[in-house]
Amino acid sequence: IHTVSGVGFTGNLDITFEKIFAKSLTNGFQVRVFPQSMNVDVALKRKLPRIGGCFECALDGCFGSHDAAMNEPYIDSLGGDGVLYYDDEKVIDFCKKANRAGLQIEMHAIGDKAFDQACRALKAALDDYPRKDHRHGIIHDCLPTEEGIKICRDYNIQMPVQSAFINWKQEPDEYLKS
């Protein structure tokens, strides 16, 4: 089950998460929760061992809207190369704080520029505070670079590949038709 909850709620109220998590305590269902935040205190306050995923931990957008961060410009969008949502300093700072707190980190990176940024940030965090069983990962990895793959291999960073949602009924695809 892959779910995203709490999006749009003020005060970070994760209602769906609370319901699923409470039910899992009584039925043996294993739940792995990644608070969708770059605020390490969100995970620590809830005593959760992980942080990240998409939304606030997304480093770029997606191909359909041309905001996946690319090293080369999109050929069909007047030379745009997508968007990195954060500068390296912010991502590295987040990764160092989360890693030092003992949290498992997941970040969303679709484009190759975002993938490289995630790799550099996780490498910096692990150089700063080495951990053997960190289980950090970069979600999507649609265009991984050789340099980034080498960092992932050398630092044991997971690459949970997730393909685009082109034919997924829940994905609003009206923008693809324009």
Task: Label the predicted regions.
Residues 21-22, 123-126, 176-178:
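Short, hinge-like loop/turn segments at secondary-structure boundaries
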Residues 24-29, 125-133:
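Short helix-capping segments at alpha-helix termini
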Residues 38-42, 139-148:
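Short, conserved secondary-structure transition motifs
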Residues 80-82, 134-136, 174-176:
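Short, contiguous strand/loop micro-motifs
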